[in-house]
């Protein structure tokens, strides 16, 4: 999520076939020094969430109000969800996904990497503009990331801005997209030292921690993640047409931080009852409610890509947060931008301006590597297929935001698929997790533990098994389409001479198909097909899963997941 409050994905894992006591992960020999975002900390100890083994993911609560003095806990009345199960429950028997954030070396090293400025002259000029607050706002249609429609004459307006906001900064020859990141000393003193304020630890990761202080989520992060999160928060706020002084946390069903301290690399946001992965109260009779939620989340993906020109690249049920009452979902947001990237055509034009030290910070360069994108358990079919041919294959968006959007929507379809399986299983959500998700997550974790640069063949094998399992699960809902999808992937590998992977894909698919029964979901699936919104849900989901090649990413998906 925006850096506001998710527990860093993958810090909690529960190995397959284990009793309730969770076993610590052993350091896998596939990890190498080239890993950018690591599964293991520097001391080689496994990362873990420091929360009860069976608890729901505890995510942030109420928004922090910046413009007023009423920042007390009484104004923040959202509470964290608790696990419904006792200590002796079988939660730990369910395989949970490891962290799969970016696996490549960081492209943004200020000392020697590509700078966004064509020469020191332009960098010095832009720094001078920022330092003097001579920032001009433009509505030019030629600049996609331009945000606001007026020229600032009153420079003191910057003293009133409390949350990151995007501006178009003009030099004599170039236009830069710069997010102004204000520094609030009062909030810094209140939240930036959570250990000293006895804040409760929600999660621990390789690059920081997530705390809860009076129901406010505090996320500490590393430099790059703080920069990209602050930048994305400013872009979303501005491109939505939000007021310049807005400090909203939720915009267009996207959860963003409403305060980022670039001095301490701390961001604040709000909490929700639970994440979608931990939601267990699915009821096929409420499909209209669920379809409406999915439509809002799909619109969030479209807004992020088509308006903001940003790929999420980490869509999973763990990064979708909801408020609910029993089986009814009232509110849902997409969060966590740790893996997000600007569309590559904007490389070299994006930065943040930090009020606290009046310096510029470059936004990390987008490399668009498929192995950098998504958790393998929710990676689109087309992305996993491309990795099998070339581990370091880059996504060709062709400067077309629709292609970027469809790639994110295909990952969203993987999330919806698991939701439908939980919704339709007559045995209940817990059994659906154990029966349909356990093997998928075990295979995905196998890929997560490998560095694709050091062990490309092992990584491709692991991704091949994940791809086969995706097709197996897809066949449970769309058995008339699964043969065509299977044959397209098989032929794709065969035509490119990847005969070993082709045979591994075939063997894994055939073996896992024998182990997967459709019977538990037949009744629920029939109920889904008999309702108007259930039929629409299955139609839209099927259309996204029929995107199996790079050319398919040009399809018009604007009518899918629309109420």
UniProtKB/Swiss-Prot annotation:
Annotated protein name in UniProt: Probable ganciclovir kinase
Gene Ontology BP term (one): viral process
Name of encoding gene: U69
Top-level taxon in the UniProt lineage: Viruses
InterPro entries, sorted: Herpes_UL97, Kinase-like_dom_sf, Tyr_kinase_AS
Active site: 314 (proton acceptor)
Annotated function: Phosphorylates the antiviral nucleoside analog ganciclovir.
Residue ranges with Polar residues bias: 1-16
Region described as Disordered: spans on this chain: 1-33
Keyword set includes Kinase: yes
Enzyme class: transferase
Claim: Cell division is one of the keywords in the record: no
Family note: Belongs to the protein kinase superfamily. Tyr protein kinase family. HCMV ganciclovir subfamily.
Molecular function per GO: ATP binding; protein kinase activity
Signal peptide annotation: none
Annotated residues for binding of ATP: 202-210, 219
EC number: 2.7.1.-
